[in-house]
Amino acid sequence: MTEAAKPPTIPELEAQERRLTLPHFTYDDAWAFGNLLVELARRRCAPVAVDIRRGGQQLFHAALPGSTPDNDAWIDRKRRVVERYGSSSYLVGCRFRAKGTTFEESSRLDPDKYAAHGGAFPITVEGAGVVGTVVVSGLPQVEDHALVVEALEQFMTRPWSSS
């Protein structure tokens, strides 16, 4: 995202979530998607950690040069927001700010365990709903979110098999 680019609006974020729905999400899909996300991050020399889960199981994790253990802590906090609200962590934070408050002030959730900062996105499967999460941590929150969305958009253009 360039400095001139505006952060997405709440309606744009909601539209992203409706549009980025997968026909299925298998172990092989998680591996392919994780590798695509890592490749996009490497091209940018982005110092990020990446985490993909389905249900309670971690299916993919990578830490790129420049990332730190703190990024894994942020991943956990952002992931919990998606699991609780069923929406991207960035959208949840934006909704609180639109009400004139912050997630930390008004959610009544422990900020050591939950963070409504951009970078965590629901993995949604047609006919099943939210089945998992993809999380990136290491960039400013708008950029973490944008990287996940870009990767999902590219991932969805691939031919789908029955795997």
UniProtKB/Swiss-Prot annotation:
It comes from the Bacteria. Signal peptide: none annotated. Transmembrane segments: none annotated. SUPFAM superfamilies: GlcG-like. InterPro entries: PduO/GlcC-like (IPR005624), PduO/GlcC-like_sf (IPR038084), YBR137W-like (IPR010371). HAMAP family: UPF0303. Belongs to the UPF0303 family. This is UPF0303 protein SAV_5210. It comes from Streptomyces avermitilis (strain ATCC 31267 / DSM 46492 / JCM 5070 / NBRC 14893 / NCIMB 12804 / NRRL 8165 / MA-4680). The lineage of its organism: Bacteria, Bacillati, Actinomycetota, Actinomycetes, Kitasatosporales.
